[in-house]
Amino acid sequence: MSAEAEAIVTTATADVSSPSKTVAVEPVAADTTPDNAPAVSTEGSGKAEQERAEKILKGKELFSQGSRNFLVKSYDEAADELSQVCQLYEEVYGELADELGQPLLLYAKALIAMALDENKVIDVPDEAADDDDEDVDDDEEESAEDGAAKKEEKKDTKEAANGASSSNGKELDTIKEGSDEADSTGEAEQAQSDEKPSKKVPTGVDEVSSSNGGGGAAVNDDERPSTSNGEVTASCSNGAAPAVEEEPEEEEGVSGSLQLAWEILEAAAQIFSRQGLSGLPYLAEVQTELANIEFENGILEAAREDYEKALKIHGELPTRNRRALAELHYKIGLTYLMQQLNKEGATALRQSSVLIEEEIAEIKGKDEPSERDRNNMLDLEETKQEILAKIQEIEEMQAQTIAEVRAALDSYIKPMSSGDAAAASSSSSSSANGAASSSSSSSKGAAAASSSTISSSSAKPTDITHLIKRKKPEDPSSEAEALCSPAKRAAV
């Protein structure tokens, strides 16, 4: 054995046999119990920190995915991912923490966009149903025409068969009866076989007419009810009825999404208002989204007030975002126009166009504008032209309204003025006639008075000679007769 090995063995035996070493080992064994307890607590805290870090990392990944889906307008997926982000951040940071501000804002915007898309898509199934109805009607007309043609062919064949039977006798009659029975049984079997696929496919008119042949088509045309009460119409109505029944559910979903977005925005507003100057841009965006919800619900005055609040918040920012300001003025103008306040709406739209012109001038003033700046400038130019066209339309509408009002007033005032003139002329003529009549009457009265005075002054007797009966003059013959006759003589 070598010297080194002997030294190792001797030192090992010395360590085992040494009492001081055993005494030194005893306190170490006694100290292991308290040393193990903090080791367990550190392991638990390490796991908690690890879980917390994993949640934060997962939340960041989900937030980036949700932001990307929001930008590409996949609002359903964005809303799902951002809701998970909000849940994870609330577990990690607590309720209404500063880290929850931006996820809540983007989540609310995704809900609003999703509700708007659902609201736009509501009428599409009805249009599709109308198209289906038109297609089914066309198919039914075609199948009816085919059936009529096939019926005529069948009648021709039957007439030919009848002529042959009359010429050939009873044998052909029996053959024809057998063929008719075979046709009837075949048609019944085909009708039964056609009822099964017609139940499965409600609108398969072309398939039924093409698979059955001549006789089957004729049977289907006879057995199938008309369009007003038939299976095809029933299937279309059954297909359209769920769409009509689903409309209230879709409207409830839209209102529920907007209500949830409203509550989320209120929570985000509390977070950003607590952050001070750094949270003002997000607070202005929150106020704008609240106004958008009110605008979509038709609460125009409240929406306009919230838009004006957003304008006020933008005024407190150190940098001026002209595009956001132009959009706010445009929305305010729309609220005015929807309330038939054309003058105020045109004023707001002009302010929006002025801000857009300033933004375009700033982009043009750059020495080397980027591709993004050039694209933005083109978009702004297009938006400006649309706003100016809207303003021109409003002005033309106002001018037309004013012209119509003036024409109506003129048409109303002219008859009145002509009536007044006629009344005035009639009154003047009547007054003139009255004056003339009064003058004539007065002249007549004066003449009568003068004649009365003249008659009274002259005192001429009235001529009543025509009333006096005069005696006939006595003839001399009568006087001689009277003298001759003793009877007529006067007594002396």
From Swiss-Prot:
Changes seen on gene knockout: Eggs laid by mutant females have reduced viability with evidence of cell cycle defects, and many fail to hatch.
Polar residues composition bias: residue spans: 226-238
Segments forming a coiled coil: 377-400
Region of interest called Disordered, as start-end residue ranges on this chain: 1-52, 123-254, 418-492
Subcellular location: Cytoplasm; Nucleus; Cytoplasm, Perinuclear region
Listed Basic and acidic residues bias regions: 147-159, 170-179
Signal peptide location: none
GO molecular function list: histone binding; histone chaperone activity
Modification Phosphothreonine occurs at: 32-33, 185
Keyword Zinc set for record: no
Sorted UniProt keywords: Coiled coil, Cytoplasm, Nucleus, Phosphoprotein, Repeat, TPR repeat
InterPro entries: NASP-like, TPR-like_helical_dom_sf, TPR_rpt
TPR repeat segments: 284-317, 326-359
Transmembrane segments: none
Biological process annotations from GO: CENP-A containing chromatin assembly; DNA replication-dependent chromatin assembly; protein stabilization
Gene Ontology cellular component list: nucleoplasm; nucleus; perinuclear region of cytoplasm
Summary of the function given for this chain in its UniProt record: Component of the histone chaperone network. Binds and stabilizes histone H3-H4 not bound to chromatin to maintain a soluble reservoir and modulate degradation by chaperone-mediated autophagy. May also bind and stabilize monomeric H3. Maternal effect gene essential for early embryogenesis.
Subunit-level organization: Interacts with the histone H3-H4 heterodimer; the interaction with H4 is probably indirect and mediated by H3 (His3, His3.3A and His3.3B). Interacts with His2Av; this interaction directly or indirectly destabilizes His2Av.
Family note: Belongs to the NASP family.
Protein name as it appears in the record: Nuclear autoantigenic sperm protein homolog
Gene: Nasp
